[in-house]
């Protein structure tokens, strides 16, 4: 395979003197928004070992002097971070601070603001990434004596345009509420946790993307003084600010010190979960605090190590990346003590200052930047991390792990649950572990393959359909889009997620090792560790599932039947004859973001089948999308309560329309009907390949953009070197080559499963068709025989044709499949149910608002036969 090997030093290469500027500069666009990654920087994005290090700022100290020599750089190694003197005449207008968690960034910011605010009229805008962080900053500022800072929560008007908002702390999603009188005149702009703040541009809750993007860009271009700080501030950010303000006006501070609570922390990745320890503890059910430890608690397991510390009287904090595991581990801990605090998205928010009252605190990513617990109360920290497509990314996990600043024993034990990662062979890891590489031990074949995969990933990001639509009005969004795709798509692979988290912890001055591998980590040992945790997670999955059952609430059906919001929901989305119990089951599934997304997509698919011209008119599809994907829908939360949740439609509908144009055609070919349970006909792998083939590459690109699934190309997977590397890094036994039809079947399964919640199931039918073979008509039998080139010239009657078909039964013995709709799919209004007398009055009213020219035309008149 003719692929150049890229070493872990690739991204440090200097830009040659006189080299051409990044694409976009020549056209008058200093941001290069048309191509967020310039060709001259391409090699930075194709080194599988150093890619994560570069994206999280680990190379800034080497990169800045080489690429922007006129930018000043200051490395601070021996104490908490400090900012440049605000009053110094040589101070530059833009200061970027990259320093680890626990390096005193916020304390230094408060000290700097105290010096910079030399007049009552000095105005300051602080932009944060979360509501909780906004409130925390306001409290810190008030306690430190910084006067007159207010939050956007205190505004009684939607637009804030004058005092007291001249010193304002605002979440980035509400930036459009700051009026022009203020926005154009701020003296100081502070972006605390700047990478997380920019990351919010990709959140489904960002409803004013174009306006927020433009306002942020204006502030970055014109504000006299800017402070941008983050533990993961990277070269992309510095390059962006240099392009806006000039490299001579940018100063970079790199803090290399972290307080002992982090630098002395020892992180250990555990190989096993230990569900047998969990089950044994729950069976004992002794009095709180009195659960006896086993004779020899198994070491190297999450629950075994946790039990040993709880039984020994230690105080423990536990991070869980999923709500369900947080509930399970809380039940386990309550066998040892009553003093357990559980914090997640479904529990009331807790005050971090009260954590010292508890022996065990369990939390999810709801506890993140801005919330910190400083007292030396906890002995150890445990972390359960489950990478999955709709879960928190590894940066969010890393930030949550830093909320407890001091651990008395200085130990962090991490279990990576690989059961949520994708197991299909079309998902291939593209990152190599940096510790293994530090000894120069990755074979050249590994680096060649993974570097090529990184290059393909970059190309897919550049080809993103969102680029053309977003680049026109959302420059910052387009500039940092690569990092967003990187963090979401790598969640499909356990190895990639583990390597990213490992890199983030290392960059934060922590010592990280893997259980049983204290010596130099070799490629073989790393791959064996991956395989071990992968199979352990699959074994433990069933035991955990049994513990996650919830008590049903029998009164919900009656409550749902009597609630007006539920009635409106049924009228808009569901068949009128749906039973209340079915509605309740559906609303439980809608409690999660992924459940709501798949529900809306399947509703839209049925709508496109009912209104076929939506596939030919963007205006018609946009009306359907606005009708179904906006507003609020009723859900039932984990507490069994009815709750209204707002839908968050995407601002870029173009790729969604393309997806439904393709999928509605496919659905029609498969005789799809949700109410009937799925596809009306079975199909073979060859049929799937034929369905996908006209637009195969577009399907892969749309799954990448809309489902964050980075599917590896079929021809690449056919390479022996790629197969060997993928098998080693996936933690799976060798799986052989992936044929063209197998690749198509995997892609088909991902399209329907990830986007619509539809299962691909093996059919028990031997012969193609929607019904039983005994019910085939004479014509249908003839078509089957002709399709397989079976001579039937001697047969005249149905009986003769049927006998001939059965005589050639083996020729139809190949695997056949069908699509199975989710259980709630039977509740939806479909094109079949639309034939009933009950018309969809609400949808008709929505479509009636479309102008006549939006509908298909024939010789200048509306073609009613196609509607």
Curated annotation (Swiss-Prot):
InterPro entries found in the cross-reference section: Helicase_ATP-bd, P-loop_NTPase, Replication_origin-bd
Amino-acid positions noted as binding ATP in the UniProt annotation, renumbered to this chain: 99-106
GO biological process: DNA replication
Ranges of biased composition (kind: Low complexity): 15-28
Positions of the Helicase ATP-binding domain: 86-251
Region annotation Disordered: where it falls in the sequence: 1-39
Subcellular location as annotated: Host nucleus
Transmembrane spans: none
Main location: host cell
Keywords on record: ATP-binding, DNA replication, DNA-binding, Host nucleus, Nucleotide-binding
GO molecular function, one term: DNA replication origin binding
Keyword Ion transport: no
GO cellular component: host cell nucleus
Coiled coil: none
Main function: Functions as a docking protein to recruit essential components of the viral replication machinery to viral DNA origins. In the presence of the major DNA-binding protein, opens dsDNA leading to a conformational change in the origin that facilitates DNA unwinding and subsequent replication.
Record's subunit section: Homodimer. Interacts with the major DNA-binding protein ICP8. Interacts with the helicase/primase component UL8 and the polymerase accessory protein UL42.
Family of this protein: Belongs to the herpesviridae OriBP family.
Protein's UniProt name: Replication origin-binding protein
Organismal lineage: Viruses, Duplodnaviria, Heunggongvirae, Peploviricota, Herviviricetes
